[in-house]
Amino acid sequence: RISNLYQSIYNGNPWLEVNLADTLKNVTAEQAYKKANPNLNTIWEIVNHLIQWRRNFLLRMQGETIVTPDHNYFVPVLDPSEAAWEQSLQTLAKSQDSWTAFFENFNDEDLAKIYVNNGHTYYEHIHGIIQHDVYHLGQIVILKKLV
């Protein structure tokens, strides 16, 4: 069930009526790169942030100890081309494929396991990455209207 929830947020029909794939589908590199406000992240920066946090959490779920960098995976985009934007979108899609593969072999008993670095259960981590995606999906929806 939790895997279906995570999948729906990426490209399904979640209760919030928007998903990441559809929201990003018609966003151009120019729009993704544009700063709506100097104090806000761009759509592209948020997408790259999501990719890195999805990777971070998946590695945690596979038993690796991960240290989050000080920049918290918010880094400026250096190549604003359409090709680079498409690469980011493909990397996001691949991250979803990785999570789908993970869930196929995941044992529900492992939900109670504790991640040693922060004392939270795997259950909390999975819900955390879902909440994280939804939080930033909301930001992307708003930024899309501003750019």
What is the predicted role of each segment?
Residues 78-113, 124:
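Acidic/histidine-rich alpha-helical segments that form the ligand environment
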Residues 3-17, 21-24, 29-74, 114-147:
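Short, contiguous alpha-helical
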